């Protein structure tokens, strides 16, 4: 069934992600993306240190490609490595930074505030760091540290907020680190900016003066043909009037 195929592909993607996270922990693994092409399967790996992903002479990336083909049944896998532009805005990288600092014995509050300062200095709108486990005493507890503005629920939280998770084994027990970051380029639906109208100077059209035409300037052209036509019309009228008078005299 189609539903089973979706679940199967999701499990395979999760297994690949966990393998790459374990393999490339020192390289600053920041996530991966899988693209299926007609040629094969493209696996894009995002890392803070791409040189460590490639390895000397491409040794590490060849080993990863071989493992993806044999253990995860990927058809003709091709691994592409991309460097993370701003590691401080990648929650997975920052979660592993918290792990490294806790393993060095630093106090969890100091670690959380240090990471928050780094993330906010990179331009993030908001950040939340959650450390849970045996952080104080023998009982499990949860400590949350946040700064700025970050969405907690709804579609904007799913669509815009980036999340990262990591675990660390310490002497008291296992701690879970959860980092959520609101990137600087996110524009929320309820963020409305009203721009001020532009003031444009419009020049009023200057009315042109129309020269007055005086009666003395209006002159009609009278040609010789017009005079002849008028004379011929007058002679015809006279002839007609004479004929009418003759008829009237005869009737009398």
Swiss-Prot record:
Gene Ontology BP, a term: translation
rRNA-binding in keyword set: yes
Region (Disordered): 233-252
A UniProt-annotated Pfam family: KH_2
All copies of domain KH type-2, residue ranges: 16-85
GO molecular function annotation: rRNA binding; structural constituent of ribosome
InterPro entries: KH_dom, KH_dom-like_a/b, KH_dom_type_2, KH_sf_prok-type, Ribosomal_S3_C_sf, Ribosomal_uS3_arc, Ribosomal_uS3_C, Ribosomal_uS3_euk/arc
Keyword Ribonucleoprotein included in the entry's annotation: yes
Any single Gene Ontology cellular-component annotation: cytosolic small ribosomal subunit
Family as reported in the entry's similarity comment: Belongs to the universal ribosomal protein uS3 family.
PANTHER family documented for this protein: 30S/40S RIBOSOMAL PROTEIN S3, SMALL RIBOSOMAL SUBUNIT PROTEIN US3
Function of the protein: Binds the lower part of the 30S subunit head.
Protein name: Small ribosomal subunit protein uS3
Native organism: Methanosphaera stadtmanae (strain ATCC 43021 / DSM 3091 / JCM 11832 / MCB-3)
